[in-house]
Amino acid sequence: MALPIILDCDPGHDDAIAIVLALASPELDVKAITSSAGNQTPDKTLRNVLRMLTLLKRSDIPVAGGAVKPLMRELIIADNVHGESGLDGPALPEPSFAPQNCTAVELMAKTLRESPQPVTLVATGPQTNVALLLNSHPELHAKIARIVIMGGAMGLGNWTPAAEFNIYVDPEAAEIVFQSGIPVLMAGLDVTHKAQIHTADIERFRAIGNPISTIVAELLDFFLEYHKDEKWGFTGAPLHDPCTIAWLLKAELFTTVERWVGVETQGKYTQGMTVVDYYFLTGNKPNATVMVDVDREGFVDLLAERLKFYG
């Protein structure tokens, strides 16, 4: 039986590729997709979800837009990474269908309520919508199998020296998620920075030769340009968000540890930092499964294999 998931995302090049991967995978049953503000403004990320589903001919999937700003802060966006549209690069279709006439939290709650089995939440942007769901619907916590997030880092940040972008945008929301008591899987920069897509990989995807693999290659062409900045020391572009979907499909590609994670909401230099108690110094019981390594070649092979689904 396929694993039911709700995808909460802020497309974003890597979010878009996570959508492509999820919908190419019969092991997953994507019940709904909700949009969060982060990589771009809320109107643009919602439009990008609709554009991707139009491209993939999946207007059957319910879509709803989420919170327009973080719980307690003003919105920060990453337009320097993802461009003016949030998905700069390829020519994508205009949306052929409209979102549901409800909020992301309402769509998530309805989906959980109606599902006969617990649902996995996959959140690849800021955690605002998930935190709002958890706070407003405590009665539905038991319907959530786990929360798989792309965010955080045990080590270095990518938006500040200490913080990864998604967590930095809404640290209060992330703290609610980590302390919810629901199993959390954290795909942080420690792993996603190893899940780099190189130029040769992009050409491999392009050579698959179907319309979707071509668009994925064009998304990656654009995404790679930003990551060529020497400060990162990258040889490719880190494909952050698809690590969440890849873990659901093939967990053996990843090395994980069980640890306690807290989110810094106050620090002068460290707001948005995920504090991972790697050496069990706090005495707190682990509340998260934390990714620490990935088989990069296996990850790329999985993407290439699933892109053939669209042939």
From Swiss-Prot:
CDD domains linked: nuc_hydro_IU_UC_XIUA
Keyword Iron: no
Similarity comment: Belongs to the IUNH family. RihA subfamily.
Spans traversing the lipid bilayer: none
One GO CC term on file: cytosol
Keywords, in A-Z order: Glycosidase, Hydrolase
GO MF assignments: purine nucleosidase activity; uridine nucleosidase activity
Record protein name field: Pyrimidine-specific ribonucleoside hydrolase RihA
